[in-house]
Design a protein with these regions (language model features):
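Short linear motifs at protein or domain termini
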Residues: 1-91, 95, 101, 133, ...
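Conserved amphipathic alpha-helical segments that form helical-bundle/coiled-coil interaction surfaces
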Residues: 78, 82, 95-161, 174-182
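Active-site loop of classical SDR/Rossmann-like NAD(P)-dependent oxidoreductases
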Residues: 167-171
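A short, amphipathic alpha-helical segment
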Residues: 14, 181-184
Length: 185
């Protein structure tokens, strides 16, 4: 299952891919990764195998590993599943959310709106995640949360692109308020 070094390397590589530090299509050589992350070849190989299973890296015969490109179709497929599961999560939250969680949801919606004014898209993406996290937690379904978190990670690197559009940002503020109202009532 990999030692502490390969697990630490794995999470660093995941983060670097998901935040776009390592770009889609970028070649990943063992030597460069060993040097960059100050580890030996074994943890690099283990991390590459796991990243391939997660769909973040593709192995190309006789060329090595590269950061996976995600097509618009991949993205739409993930979004389609996420929307369906998120609706289930919201339905569950309607009957299971506590007053404290409802207040937390309102604060998260307000925080998203406040963060919008700052113009920092990475922070805005995090504020959006925080809003949805409150719903996931209050739906009180561990398996559903795991799947939703996995889907969220798969599209993380596109979220910042998506948030560049002002119309999209305004739509999300409206959507957050509608979700809050639906759960409250």
């Amino acid at each position: 299952n990999g030692g502490p070094i390969s697990n630490s390397l794995l999470s660093k590589l995941q983060k670097d891919i998901l935040t776009g530090k390592l770009k889609a299509g970028q070649k990943l050589t063992e030597q460069e990764l060993c040097r960059e992350y100050e580890v030996s070849r074994t943890p690099v190989r283990e991390a590459m195998r796991k990243l391939e299973l997660e769909g973040l890296v593709v192995m190309i015969p006789r060329r090595g590993a590269q950061v996976a490109n995600i097509t618009e179709k991949d993205l739409n497929d993930v979004l389609e599943v996420r929307i369906a599961l998120e609706n289930l999560s919201i339905e569950n939250a309607c009957t299971r959310m506590t007053e404290e969680q409802l207040e937390e949801l309102w604060n998260a919606a307000k925080n998203f709106e406040a963060t919008m004014a700052e113009g920092n898209l990475v922070k805005l993406a995090e504020a959006d995640v925080a809003f949805h996290e409150v719903i996931y937690k209050s739906s009180d379904n561990r398996r559903l949360n795991q799947v939703l978190n996995n889907l969220r990670e798969q599209i993380y690197r596109y979220r910042v692109e998506y948030l560049k559009d002002e119309e999209t940002r305004n739509l999300l503020v409206k959507e957050h308020k509608e979700i809050y109202a639906a759960i409250k009532n």
